[in-house]
Amino acid sequence: PELAFDEIEGLGPNGGFTNSICHVDHALKASVSFEEFCKNPKPIVVGAVQGASCFGPAYEFTFILDTELRRRKIRDKVPMTFVTAEPYIGHLGLDGVGDTKGLLESEMREHHIKWMTSTRVKKVEDGKMHVEEVNPDGSVKTAAELPFGFSMMLPAFRGIKPLMGVEGLVNPRGFVLVDKHQQNPTYKNVFSVGVCVAIPPMGPSPVPCGVPKTGFMIESMVTATALNIGAMLRGQAPRHQGTWNAVCLADFGDSGVAFVAQPQIPPRNVNWASSGKWVHAAKIAFEKYFIRKMRKGESEPFYETAALNMLGISKLKQVITD
């Protein structure tokens, strides 16, 4: 997708005043900015703007910053504020998973991080962010100017220009419409997977919130799509459906939060979340395992499939046929 930095004045790393971690080059630039910031610590503002759908990395980045500032012995010089479009902390675009609200609020209190929810960013200036907290009825609750020396705000996403405005193919934001088989209802030869898929929001919220597309969920989309294309090539109708299950490890630098949502979109069969230092260790182990797997060219080794099956986590729904 496209990163819609241009929808908010002053947002983004290219000509704006905030950083991003959406691309490798953005992350490298953010690292340089952070090193400069540490020479002269000031307030930090991190979060996700209106229309964003990828909230998890904003939480991870916030707590990883907190951990790094403590390691450098300058955390006491840096007030931190988390600004998000979510109606509550831990919503994640999913109306929460398990007790992510309680877990993440507790972590923020423990780490002295203030937060603002149902908040839209009006514009960003050099060292100053203009925001509005919004009431449930859509009226402005409070307007504020947040000073910062370093900021990372995740933007909203939108579809790519070649697809924009194609009736029956995409929604108004340019995301591809699909049915339960990942197939576009109008253009039967078009399948879509990943971030470009159109998923309705969980429900009305004072400030627009998108729905995230997580890694395992996307793998389930890809699995179903590959099998359905194969079926069509054999003259059969598509019948495979991805589970859209979510298995996530959010690393907080020295601890973290893990959650399992089956499926990711409620109502769910499994709705579990937990936290602790074990999540940090598990995330490091998974990253090393995943990189090794990719280098070897293995998408899903048999032992990974066996482990997921043992945990009752699958990529495909069981489809009953006559």
Each model region followed by its residue ranges:
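Cofactor-binding loop segments of dinucleotide-utilizing enzymes, especially the Rossmann-like FAD-
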Residues: 49, 85-87, 195
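FAD-site-proximal beta/loop scaffold in flavoenzymes
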Residues: 2-7, 11-40, 147-220
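C-terminal auxiliary extensions adjacent to catalytic cores
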Residues: 259-322
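A Rossmann-like FAD-binding core segment of flavoenzymes
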Residues: 66-175, 236-238
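Flavin (FAD/FMN) cofactor-binding core of flavoprotein oxidoreductases
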Residues: 240-258
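Rossmann-like NAD(P)H-binding beta-loop-alpha module
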Residues: 23-81
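Short, flexible/disordered intra-domain loops and linkers
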Residues: 58, 90-96, 203-210
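Internal hydrophobic alpha-helix adjacent to the cofactor/substrate pocket in enzyme cavities
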Residues: 216-244
